[in-house]
């Protein structure tokens, strides 16, 4: 269904199935029927450990309510996500510092989540989601709890991450951001009702 170098938005009211669809794509939830393919290969949901590693390598996830670790700094929150796959702490820290610069938060590296604004926390979440250079970025209402100006900044960062080797899928109930995607899927009652390219 999805082509790389594209941003896909999934739009629909609360309860329409947007988050459920993202949870299925991210392998957090198991489908009750049908299958999920990645690069034209089906995912085997009987191999949970293998899927956890696959998700960590291939999929970056950004949530509406950031789930940053409260007792760790912004820098630590980012590089710890890399250590789940690699044991090279120095390399992880170097990558995390680069990503903080990318999201314009170098001056917040040693700040804890409680010291960050909502927009800053979301930018840390984006940096953490991409530290393993995933092929797919899933964002569940990434701008939902932000004021409009901050939301536009966060959305621009997502647009800047689009590349020939990566696709971005985000769920939203905000028509303004949904219309800025390359492809819009509208959901109602758990089904895709309309696709606008």
Language model feature labels by segment:
Residues 43-60, 163:
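ABC ATPase NBD coupling module
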Residues 131-135:
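A short, proline-enriched helix->beta-strand linker immediately N-terminal to the Walker B motif
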Residues 137-140:
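Catalytic Walker B motif of ABC-type/P-loop ATPase nucleotide-binding domains
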Residues 26:
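Helix-to-loop junction immediately C-terminal to a conserved catalytic motif
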Residues 112-122:
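Conserved ABC ATPase signature
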Residues 72-81:
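Short coil-to-helix segment of the ABC ATPase nucleotide-binding domain corresponding to the Q-loop/switch region
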Residues 34-45:
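Conserved ABC transporter NBD signature motif
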């Amino acid at each position: 269904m999805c082509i790389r170098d594209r941003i896909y938005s999934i739009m629909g009211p609360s309860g329409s199935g947007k988050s459920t669809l993202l949870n299925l794509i991210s392998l957090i939830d198991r489908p009750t029927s049908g299958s999920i393919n990645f690069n034209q290969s089906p995912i085997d949901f009987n191999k949970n450990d293998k899927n956890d590693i696959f998700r960590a390598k291939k999929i970056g996830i950004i949530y509406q309510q950031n789930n940053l670790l409260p007792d760790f700094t912004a820098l630590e929150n980012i590089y710890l996500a890399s250590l789940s796959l690699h044991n090279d702490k120095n390399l992880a820290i170097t990558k995390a510092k680069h990503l903080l610069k990318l999201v314009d938060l170098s001056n917040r590296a040693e700040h804890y989540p409680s010291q960050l604004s909502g927009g800053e926390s979301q930018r840390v979440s984006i940096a953490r989601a991409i530290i393993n250079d995933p092929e797919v970025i899933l964002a569940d209402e990434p701008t939902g709890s932000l004021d409009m100006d901050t939301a536009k900044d966060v959305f621009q960062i997502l647009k800047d991450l689009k590349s020939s080797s990566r696709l971005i899928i985000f769920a939203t109930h905000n028509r303004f951001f949904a219309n800025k995607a390359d492809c819009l899927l509208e959901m109602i009652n758990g089904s895709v009702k309309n696709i606008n390219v």
